[in-house]
Amino acid sequence: MRVADFHFDLPESLIARHPLAERRASRLLQLDGPSGALRHGQFTDLLEQLRPGDLMVFNNTRVIPARLFGQKASGGRLEVLVERVLDQHRVLAHVRSSKSPKPGSQILIEGGGEAEMVARHDALFELRFAEPVLPLLERVGHMPLPPYIDRPDDEADRERYQTVYAEKAGAVAAPTAGLHFDDELLAAIRAKGVETAFVTLHVGAGTFQPVRVERIEDHHMHSEWLEVSQEVVDAVAACRARGGRVVAVGTTSVRSLETAAQSSELKPFSGDTDIFIYPGRPFHVVDALVTNFHLPESTLLMLVSAFAGYAETMAAYRAAVEQGYRFFSYGDAMFITRNPAARGPEV
């Protein structure tokens, strides 16, 4: 399959650069995978699509204010984007600077703080901070907005680029399908008899990296840490036993569950995943999906195409553009039921 098969034209005006006033105010495009039928509505219509006995699986990762500004001891300016917290004082990070810092060099952090460049690991730099890193980031860090939101972060992003159920710090990008849920909607979902469970996948900056090969089979995914607990495994088993559906909120929840079920049986899992889901790959756990609209030629669009079918997905995206849906992290959402006969692009 060619990466170019997953291209679509998107007007700049449809890229959402700010969140709506209310989380639940987004629109919802419903795609019935088996038939390809589309239905336009509001995000709160999701409640009508859920059934008593269903299980919704959310990603409870918490976005850290991972972007830092500072300067080298020589005075040169630089920007640090933390990719992964290794321990209380060490991180792996991307560093943007006219000249890369050398091992042993000091970095002075804007707002107060200091780090030492310890080593380079391919494109990432290992930094050691003088003080505990998570409190430092909370104090002087900036929210790591995606590159297509071309504006400085503001105070509102600290709340809105974060799900209301975020718990475990470590992501440098939000699991954006979850941004549409507020406490009231979650309560209404539970009141309907829908169960909830939480996985953790710390979303990395690699989620925004373009696919740089022509054939998608040649692409290698970035690695991210995730955890699927025994509690989640038991919740899925109970859902199956009562005839319910597993509804994943976001592609990160899909990747978590399907990683933990690569042997066809869902088992507890804790560790790194580089799972790449594209058309032709079977799904072992997820029956329905809540997801935002993704970038052209992105691995996430390929995942959705694997779930709903290539032709059905691309038709839905064309309809979304025609109807003026808002795209990407702060944009609108889709609710998709899995197409068991999903096919990739025609060769």
UniProtKB/Swiss-Prot annotation:
Pathway(s) of this molecule: tRNA modification; tRNA-queuosine biosynthesis
One Pfam short name: Queuosine_synth
Catalysed transformations (reactions): 7-aminomethyl-7-carbaguanosine(34) in tRNA + S-adenosyl-L-methionine = epoxyqueuosine(34) in tRNA + adenine + L-methionine + 2 H(+)
Subcellular localization, as worded in the UniProt entry: Cytoplasm
Keywords, alphabetical: Cytoplasm, Queuosine biosynthesis, S-adenosyl-L-methionine, Transferase
Domain of life: Bacteria
InterPro entries, sorted: QueA, QueA_dom1, QueA_dom2, QueA_sf
GO biological process entries: queuosine biosynthetic process; tRNA wobble guanine modification
Molecular function (Gene Ontology), one example: S-adenosylmethionine:tRNA ribosyltransferase-isomerase activity
GO cellular component term of the entry, any: cytoplasm
Major site of localization recorded for this protein: cytoplasm
Catalytic activity, EC: 2.4.99.17
PANTHER family xref list: S-ADENOSYLMETHIONINE:TRNA RIBOSYLTRANSFERASE-ISOMERASE (PTHR30307:SF0)
Protein family per UniProt: Belongs to the QueA family.
Oligomer and partners: Monomer.
Protein purpose: Transfers and isomerizes the ribose moiety from AdoMet to the 7-aminomethyl group of 7-deazaguanine (preQ1-tRNA) to give epoxyqueuosine (oQ-tRNA).
Protein name (record): S-adenosylmethionine:tRNA ribosyltransferase-isomerase
Gene name, Swiss-Prot/TrEMBL: queA
